[in-house]
C-alpha cells in the first residue's frame, strides 16, 4: 500500500516520490513537517516564554524603589545597614582596620578632587589660568635643543612690557646668567597642583606666580597691583586741592586747609618734612617719585609733579614767604591759621587781619599826637 510505503519512509522527503502516491507522500511529508513545526514552535515558545518571564521580572524590579546606598564600613564588617541617617551612629565610624582606612583615604581624595575642580573653574572664570596642550616628546627635544644656546629665558635685563613666553612644561629650571637674576625659580615641571601621571587640562601661568615672589623690573611700582606708595598727607593734599580748584583758589593755598590735625605743619618746613617721612612707608631713596613718572589716573591734576618729598620746598615755607616777611615771628601763626579747617572767607579775613596788624602800629602814633596837640 502506498500509505505503508509512505510511513516506512517518513524521513525521506527529498527523495523523488512514487508516481501513484504523491498525495499520501504529501500527507506524510506534511505530518513530519507539522511535527517538526510543533517541536520547533514549542522550543521557540519556551524560549519566548522564558524571555517574557525575565522581562516581567525586570519590569517588576524597575517598579520597586531605587536601591538605597548601604554603609561601606558596616559592609566591611558583615552588616548591611542603610546609609541614610546612619553616619553619626555607625558602630565602626572610628574603625582603623585596613578596609576602613582605605575608605577614609578614598573620601579624602574625592574631597580634594572636588575642591580642585571648583578652584580651577574659578580661576578659569577670572582668567588666571588657561588650557595649554602638552607637547609631545619630540617637540620637547626640539625645544631643548633650540634653547640650549640661551640658558636664561627670563631675566631682569629684559625691558619689554610683555614678558617672554614661559619655558616648556617638562623642562627643569635653568641656571641664571651672570648679568641678570632669574625671575622664574623652582617652578614645578608640569603643574603646581600635582597629578603628574594625569596631566590636567588647566596649567597655571608661571608669570602669575613669579610676580608674587620676585621684584619687578621697575622699582617704583613694586607691588602686585601697581599702586604707588603715597603717604596719607599727600592723598589729603590731592583731595583738598581738587576742592580748592572747584572753589576758585590756588591748589597750594587750599591744599593745606583740609589737612587733618596730625599733618598740620609747625613753625618751619622741617617739621612738615619729618612728619611726612614718619607717616609714609619705609621706602628707600630708589623708590622716590621723580618727575618722569606719569601721574596716576586717580589723582587730580592739581598735584604737581615738581614737588617731591625730599627735593622740593615745603608748602609751609612757600606760604610763609608769600604772606609775611621772613624776619617776623608770625610766620608760624600765619601757616597754622591758614591750615586750620575753616571756610575760605574766614581764613582770608584772619590772614588780612594778621597781615595788617604789623603796619597798623605806625599810623597810630600821629593820631595820638594830634589829640595831645
Curated annotation (Swiss-Prot):
GO terms for biological process: male germ cell proliferation; male sex determination; male sex differentiation; negative regulation of meiotic nuclear division; negative regulation of transcription by RNA polymerase II; positive regulation of mitotic nuclear division; positive regulation of transcription by RNA polymerase II; regulation of transcription by RNA polymerase II. Its main location: nucleus. GO terms for cellular component: nucleus. Residues 1-72, 148-179, 316-373 are annotated as: Disordered. Belongs to the DMRT family. It is found in: Nucleus. It comes from Sus scrofa (Pig). Residues 67-113 bind DNA. This is Doublesex- and mab-3-related transcription factor 1. The lineage of its organism: Eukaryota, Metazoa, Chordata, Craniata, Vertebrata. Residues 38-54 have a biased composition (Gly residues). Keywords: Activator, Developmental protein, Differentiation, DNA-binding, Metal-binding, Nucleus, Phosphoprotein, Repressor, Sexual differentiation, Transcription, Transcription regulation, Tumor suppressor, Zinc. Transcription factor that plays a key role in male sex determination and differentiation by controlling testis development and male germ cell proliferation. Plays a central role in spermatogonia by inhibiting meiosis in undifferentiated spermatogonia and promoting mitosis, leading to spermatogonial development and allowing abundant and continuous production of sperm. Residues 8-18, 327-346 have a biased composition (Low complexity).
Amino acid at each position: 500500500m502506498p500509505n505503508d510505503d509512505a510511513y516506512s519512509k517518513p524521513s525521506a522527503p527529498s527523495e523523488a516520490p512514487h508516481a501513484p502516491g504523491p498525495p499520501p507522500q504529501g500527507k506524510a511529508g506534511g505530518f513530519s513537517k507539522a511535527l517538526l513545526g510543533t517541536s520547533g514552535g514549542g522550543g521557540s515558545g519556551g524560549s519566548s516564554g522564558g524571555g517574557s518571564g525575565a522581562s516581567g521580572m525586570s519590569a517588576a524590579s524597575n517598579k520597586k524603589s531605587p536601591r538605597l546606598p548601604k554603609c561601606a564600613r558596616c559592609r566591611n564588617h558583615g552588616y548591611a545597614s542603610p546609609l541614610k541617617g546612619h553616619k553619626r551612629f555607625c558602630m565602626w565610624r572610628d574603625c582603623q582596620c585596613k578596609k576602613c582606612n582605605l575608605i577614609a583615604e578614598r573620601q579624602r581624595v574625592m574631597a580634594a578632587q572636588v575642591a580642585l575642580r571648583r578652584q580651577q573653574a574659578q580661576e578659569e572664570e577670572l582668567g588666571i589660568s588657561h588650557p595649554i596642550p602638552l607637547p609631545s616628546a619630540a617637540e620637547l627635544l626640539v625645544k631643548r635643543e633650540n634653547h640650549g644656546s640661551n640658558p636664561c629665558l627670563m631675566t631682569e635685563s629684559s625691558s619689554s612690557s610683555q614678558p617672554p613666553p614661559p619655558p616648556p612644561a617638562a623642562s627643569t629650571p635653568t641656571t641664571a646668567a651672570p648679568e641678570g637674576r632669574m625671575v622664574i625659580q623652582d617652578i614645578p615641571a608640569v603643574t603646581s597642583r600635582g597629578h603628574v601621571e594625569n596631566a590636567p587640562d588647566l596649567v597655571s601661568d608661571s608669570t602669575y606666580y613669579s610676580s608674587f615672589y620676585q621684584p619687578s623690573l621697575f622699582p617704583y611700582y613694586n607691588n602686585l597691583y601697581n599702586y604707588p606708595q603715597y603717604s596719607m598727607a599727600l592723598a589729603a593734599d590731592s583731595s583738598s586741592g581738587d576742592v580748592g580748584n572747584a572753589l576758585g583758589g590756588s591748589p597750594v593755598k587750599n591744599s593745606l586747609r583740609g589737612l587733618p590735625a596730625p599733618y598740620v605743619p609747625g613753625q618751619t618746613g622741617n617739621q612738615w618734612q619729618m612728619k611726612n617721612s614718619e607717616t609714609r612707608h619705609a621706602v628707600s631713596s630708589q623708590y622716590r617719585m621723580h618727575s618722569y613718572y606719569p601721574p596716576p589716573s586717580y589723582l587730580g591734576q592739581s598735584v604737581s609733579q615738581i614737588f617731591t618729598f625730599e627735593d622740593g620746598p615745603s608748602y609751609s615755607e612757600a606760604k610763609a614767604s608769600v604772606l609775611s616777611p621772613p624776619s617776623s615771628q608770625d610766620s608760624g601763626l600765619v601757616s597754622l591759621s591758614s591750615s586750620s579747617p575753616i571756610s575760605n572767607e574766614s581764613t582770608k579775613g584772619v590772614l588780612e587781619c594778621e597781615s595788617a596788624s604789623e603796619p597798623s602800629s605806625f599810623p597810630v602814633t600821629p593820631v595820638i599826637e594830634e589829640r595831645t596837640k
